[in-house]
UniProtKB/Swiss-Prot annotation:
It is linked to Deafness, autosomal recessive, 15: A form of non-syndromic sensorineural hearing loss with prelingual onset. Sensorineural deafness results from damage to the neural receptors of the inner ear, the nerve pathways to the brain, or the area of the brain that receives sound information. Residues 1-32 are annotated as: Disordered. The keyword Repressor does not apply. Coiled coil: none annotated. Residues 1-13 have a biased composition (Basic and acidic residues). Widely expressed in adult and fetal tissues. Highest levels are found in jejunum, lymph node, parietal lobe, fetal spleen and fetal thymus. Expressed in cervical, melanoma, chronic myelogenous and gastric cancer cell lines. InterPro entries: GH2_GIPC (IPR055349), GIPC1-3_GH1 (IPR056814), GIPC1/2/3 (IPR017379), PDZ (IPR001478), PDZ_sf (IPR036034). SUPFAM superfamilies: PDZ domain-like. Residues 18-30 have a biased composition (Pro residues). Keywords: Deafness, Disease variant, Non-syndromic deafness. This is PDZ domain-containing protein GIPC3.
Length: 312
């Protein structure tokens, strides 16, 4: 007789393999966390290297640098990138390359000079640091100011005829200087950047408008904004750089200022508009405090168009 176990085995079919359970769905990939942005910094006249992070605009940047070196933020006149020298082509504006080294130029000696305005133009190009100080970016060869040896590129203008201009924007200071009457002497109170020994005696000036040096290293930059958070962006395109340079040149010729960040903002605004009239309306809403004259806006629109054609 067959055993019960044998009969049971013969009468039982091999069970069909069951389908494997469905694999658990992959959770959506978490967005890649951006690494902390830490920048190296020194005082331009000499100091140990500090590290700063967590700023979104120029005022906050100055506060972080001041904290790193135990000084007041108001001691900082301006910053340059990757050079400790008073080099106006390396000024820190609205963008910092992620590998850039920041040098802070602090207040040095105060000096007063008397100037007589014998011509309509003094020969100064003014810019500002975005935190309340206007300073000299360029001195035109052969101009009134060029003949005054005590006045140097990088000097901050603190007062005109004892009237403090601390807190004024560059275009306001340039307008005050333009409106000073001819043939009457006036006094400028200037603060020069503190200098290391190897920087003493430099007096940089230029009558021309060289192309602003590219100070970013790498294709990403930290874009500082006067309102809102800073953002990491791709470095400007060839068109954006060329258009911004042309607009900055026009700012200098019309208003006596240079401001690459302002020029960049105007180029960005132009991308959202299809005509000079629409561009003018957008500028009024974004940059109304500048009160740009109509003929200036038309020239800016044309210059941006030329840059777009040149860069394809």
């Amino acid at each position: 007789m067959e055993g019960a176990a044998a009969r049971e085995a013969r009468g039982t079919e091999t069970p069909r393999a069951s389908a494997p359970p469905p694999a658990p769905s992959e959770p959506p990939a978490a967005p890649r966390a951006r690494p902390r942005l830490v920048f190296r910094t020194q005082l331009a006249h000499g100091s140990p290297t500090g590290k700063i992070e967590g700023f979104t605009n120029v005022r906050e940047l100055y506060a972080k640098i001041a904290e790193a070196f135990g000084i007041a933020p108001t001691e900082i006149l301006f910053c340059t990138l990757n050079s400790h020298k008073v080099d106006m082509q390396k000024l820190l504006g609205g963008q910092i390359g992620l590998e850039d080294f920041i040098f802070a130029h602090v207040r040095g000696e105060t000096k007063e000079v008397e100037v007589t305005k014998t011509e309509d133009a003094l020969g100064l190009t003014i810019t500002d640091n975005g935190a309340g100080y206007a300073f000299i970016k360029r001195i035109k060869e052969g101009s009134i100011i060029n003949r005054i040896e005590a006045v140097c590129v990088g000097d901050s203008i603190e007062a005109i005829n004892d009237h403090s201009i601390v807190g004024c924007r560059h275009y306001e200071v340039a307008k005050m200087l333009r409106e000073l009457p001819k043939s009457q002497p006036f006094t400028l109170r200037l603060v020069q950047p503190k200098r290391a020994f190897d920087m003493i005696g430099q007096r940089s000036r230029s009558s021309k408008c060289p192309v602003e040096a590219k100070v970013t290293s790498g294709r990403e930059t930290l874009r500082l904004r006067s309102g809102g958070a800073a953002t990491v962006e791709e470095a400007p395109s060839e068109f954006e750089e060329e258009a911004s340079r042309k607009v900055d040149d026009l700012l200098e010729s019309y208003m006596g200022i240079r401001d690459p960040e302002l020029a960049s903002t105007m180029v960005e605004t132009s991308k959202k508009t299809a005509s000079a009239q629409e561009f003018a309306r957008c500028l009024d809403s974004v940059l109304g405090e500048f009160a740009f004259p109509d003929e200036f806006v038309v020239e800016v629109w044309a210059a941006i168009g030329e840059a777009r054609e040149a860069c394809g």
